[in-house]
C-alpha cells in the first residue's frame, strides 16, 4: 500500500527505493524503460538493481487546443490514444485535437531518435517491461507507453513510479499488469511536491544514463 505523505531527497533516492519494491515483483527476462527526462534517471537505478538492460520510451501528452496543460490523450511510438468522450464533453474540435496529436507524434520520433543515438530499440518480445517515470499526473502518457510495449511483444507490463495520484493503479489496470506507486499524496498538486530536490534534467544526463544502461547488453538488441 502506498504511503500518503513522504518526500524523497531526489530522483536517485526515489529510484533506489522503487528498485527494491520492483525487485520483489519481477523475474528475468526484464527490460526497464525510462520515460524522459526525469524518469530515465529513476529508471537507471531500477535497471542497475535488477541487472536489466535500460532503454527509453517517449510518450507525449496531447493537450487540448487553447489549453495545452489539459490532457485529452497521448501518443507514443506507433500509438495514438485520444479521450474522445472528453473531447466531446469539452466541445473541442476533433480535427484540431488530431492535428495536435500528429505534431506530438512527430516530436516522439525526433526525441526517440536523439535518445537512442541511431541504435535500434532493445528487444521487448518475451520480456517483462518495467515502465518507470519520476511521477505521474494523469496517467495518459504511461498508458500510451504501456500500449507501445504491448505492441512490441512484452509478455508483462509493470508501471513503477515514486509518486502518483490516488486511484492511479485502478486507472491503469486495463492496460498494465501491475502498478507500483510509493507515495500517493492527498491532496496531489504535482510530481515535484514529493521531492526535496527536483531540478530539470538535461538531455546530456538522459543520454549518459542510457549509454551506461546499454553497456554489456548488446546481445539484447534486435
What are these regions (language model features)?
Residues 1-222:
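PRPP-associated nucleotide enzymes
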